[in-house]
Amino acid sequence: MKLAICSGYFNPMHIGHLDYLQSAKDLAEKLFVIVNNDYQVSIKGSTPFMSEVDRVRIISTLECVDKVVLSKDLDDTVLKTLKSILIQHQACGRNSFIFCNGGDRGSENTAEEYFCDNNNYY
C-alpha cells in the first residue's frame, strides 16, 4: 500500500488546501495529514485563527483524508511526527511512501524533503 503524507497549518483551511490534499490522495491509496500544533503556529508568527483541535476536526471530515495526526514537534518542522508515522507504517510491512508539500513552499529544500531524500523516500 502506498501512503501519502501531507502537512500544514490549515490556519484557516481554504480551497488551495483542499486541492493540495485531493491531489496527494490521487498519488496513493491512503492519505495521512499532519496538522501543525498551536505552538508551531505561535513560533511561525501567525495569528491563531483556529485552535489545533478545530483544525484537526475540520481536516478529519474530508473524504480524501484517511487519518489526521497532530504534530508533536516543537520547532517549525514535522520531522519527529513524520518519523513516527513512518516507523509504524514500516512495522506493518509497508514501505511505499510519498511526502507531499503544498504549492506555497519555495524551491529550497525543507527539513522534511532533506530527510526523505537522504532516506530514499519520495
Residue ranges and their predicted role:
Residues 1-122:
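Nucleotidyltransferase catalytic core that binds NTPs
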